[in-house]
Amino acid sequence: MNEKIVREQRGGEDSPSSVSAKSATAAASASTASMTFASAALESHKTTTITTASSSPRTSGASASASSSSRSASAPASSSSQQEKQPMLNATDMRELREIKQLLWGDNVREDVFKRWSQGFEFSKVEPSALVQKQGGPCAVIAPVQAYLLKIIIMDLPGIKLSEISLDKSQNLLIQALCDILKNCRAPRYRIVHLLRRRGNATEAGSTKKRSPAGEEESALAGQAAGSSEEVEEAAEATPASVSKLSQALQLEHDMHQELSPDEFHERLHTLHFKNIAAVARYYMENYDQLAHTYGVLLFMYSVFLTKGLELVAADISDTSEPLIHSTYGYGGQSLINLMLTGRAVAHVWDNEQDVGGLKLRGICEQSDIGFITLMEEMRYCTVGSFFKNPRYPVWVMGSDTHLTVLFSNEKRLVSPETPSETGRRIFKSYDPEGNNFISTTMLREVLIALNLVSEPAYVALMQKRLDPENLGIILLNAFMDEFFPLESRSTPDTFELMHYNGIPGSNENNKVRYYCGTAILLEGDLKSVCTSNPMVTCLQTKWPNIEINWHDGHMPSLN
């Protein structure tokens, strides 16, 4: 099956008429997967759709579209003067892309902010799996992508040396990470945003990237990881040369590093429709330069929004009056971060819903693959819930007031299921927002109810006297834990290794993006050391209140 995936022709160029004839022939031939692209110019340009048809005469378009394809297929290939048929207009994609632009940028896209976001997915020269962020702003996309990439390494490549990962392997890990984020949208189809190139006099017509034999083998593995084996096999059989030829027809001659204005960029956006994630992985393998070129990060961000669907995104956000990308500073809002991490664009980081002044404000509704902790919680700007603090994998995006970085570990016990003791401690602390390690005696019944413990009034009154014998009006955390969870050990180890990533070169030693490793120690007791001059430790303490960490090589990583 792997041979089918990587067996693609990457040979010489086709003339425009040849490409048109071959694409039309492929559309009429036997194929079961539908792949649609639509030109979604945001103002006055046309939106187009091409469908690789099924073996029956039916297609995803109207019958007129099918007959048009048949006429194109019967036309002589040598008729170079015959113009390529214009596929049908996809008004939905055009409308949604226009509204997504408004949702992200507001009424006007500032040139300087747009330039900060205009970068591709690029790896560090000294840390082959670490993405580089060239300027402030796109960390709202780059940091979550890096987190998912590291999750794949931790879970699927145990024991691998990060410094020995090849470039081809890193590229395929990136594709898997992007597919994971798209899968979180739980959409019936995947709408991938593509930058159509302007015709020119360049000699290279296609953008299909030449890969080494090892790289092609890695591409097959990436396709397998992105979807089930059945999905990958279906994609391999259903879209053989047709996907490649269709991609070449889309990828007109153009300098991929040409600088575009915001209007020019949005006028060239097209969409490709895929039924399964394995086909998306194949597309990215065949068109890796769409990720690596100047607008790769923006294209993927638009793909996530379009795949999720504008109506669902707007329902998650609730308040769409403010753009998701700050018009002055260029950083992404929490809704954008949450969409990349969880597939839902909710604006808050607490668990489930909270009633604030009669308004139901939505937070994170389930345990996420990737966690999130932030310095802003220590500053009392927000409360991060258990779903984000205790993700499925030991990877957390870390937020400062201006930037996002990534914390990760190979220690899987950091995300093992909570013991009853840890649940009790967490619930108790949720009633102690100031971090004083005590609660009001009157809150004891609420805590017991939250823990599903006995909460009869007579029993609560008895426990209040026992836990507050001097009638001070407070119950200490230690007294509560000793009474209800005596001698229970915690699941988190006392010492473990942590690693940190910051994608901005200027925030790294010698301006080279790399991972920094440290040894963490969880101290006895519940009193945390206060170190206001160390934002890294302060942020870590929102997850592990009694943590201390010694960074190797004496270098303290930066959150900014």
Curated annotation (Swiss-Prot):
Q: What does this protein do?
A: Hydrolase that can remove 'Lys-48'-linked conjugated ubiquitin from proteins.
InterPro entries from the UniProt entry: EF-hand-dom_pair, MINDY-3/4_CD, MINY3/4
Which of the residues bear the PTM Phosphoserine? S212, S219
Single GO BP term: protein K48-linked deubiquitination
Q: Which UniProt keywords apply?
A: Hydrolase, Phosphoprotein, Protease, Thiol protease, Ubl conjugation pathway
Q: What is this protein called?
A: Ubiquitin carboxyl-terminal hydrolase MINDY-3 homolog
* UniProt region (Disordered), positions on chain: 1-30, 44-91, 203-237
Q: Which organism is it from?
A: Drosophila melanogaster (Fruit fly)
